[in-house]
């Protein structure tokens, strides 16, 4: 039986094209202004923490690629009913993460890096589970790269610490996340 399918070919082409084009300019077509501002602040905080512009760019670029590929898969109805259930659990976990991140910022002395790291790790695992049959090993390593960076205890401690410029970055990130929560976009 011939397994050629133009739908599958088009989907592969979209995913390949997105992986080659995941720059901030292209992302602006797919990502709203608030999300873009959050990504900018995550980039600045990551660059400050790693002292490595290229590494910070790579982390954010990988994050953008993941989001864009998820969008392509979802828009093209590629998820099975079981995978859609996992994606719904992932969405709820991301919502919990957003609320937790904002609350830790707003209420002094409540931050616990173990909680944030644990929720990020759960998000990563759910995402792997949902896309296991759709993305390449390279895409799965991108997921690990992004989530492992943001779940790192030392990074979280720096981000939520009292020192500048992290305080300013965190404030702006949380303002954006809070706006997305209010608009029910997360």
From Swiss-Prot:
Pfam families in alphabetical order: DUF758 (PF05527)
One Gene Ontology term, aspect cellular component: cytoplasm
Subcellular location(s) per record: Cytoplasm
Alphabetized Gene3D superfamilies for the sequence: Tumor necrosis factor alpha-induced protein 8-like (1.20.1440.160)
Keywords: Cytoplasm
UniProt record, GO biological process: negative regulation of TOR signaling; regulation of apoptotic process
Stated family: Belongs to the TNFAIP8 family.
Protein name: Tumor necrosis factor alpha-induced protein 8-like protein 1
Recorded name of the encoding gene: TNFAIP8L1
């Amino acid at each position: 039986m011939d397994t050629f399918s133009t739908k599958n070919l088009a989907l592969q082409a979209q995913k390949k094209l997105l992986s080659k084009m995941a720059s901030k300019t292209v992302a602006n077509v797919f990502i709203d202004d608030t999300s873009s501002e959050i990504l900018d602040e995550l980039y600045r905080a990551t660059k400050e923490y790693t002292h490595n512009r290229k590494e910070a760019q790579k982390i954010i670029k990988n994050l953008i690629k993941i989001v864009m590929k998820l969008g392509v898969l979802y828009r093209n109805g590629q998820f099975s009913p079981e995978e859609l259930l996992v994606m719904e659990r992932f969405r709820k976990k991301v919502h919990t993460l957003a609320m937790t991140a904002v609350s830790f910022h707003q209420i002094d002395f409540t931050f616990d890096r173990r909680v944030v790291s644990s929720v990020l790790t759960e998000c990563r695992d759910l995402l792997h589970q949902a896309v296991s049959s759709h993305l390449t090993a390279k895409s799965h390593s991108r997921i690990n790269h992004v989530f492992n960076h943001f779940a790192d205890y030392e990074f979280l401690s720096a981000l939520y610490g009292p020192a500048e410029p992290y305080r300013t970055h965190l404030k702006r990130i949380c303002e954006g996340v809070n706006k997305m929560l209010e608009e029910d976009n997360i």
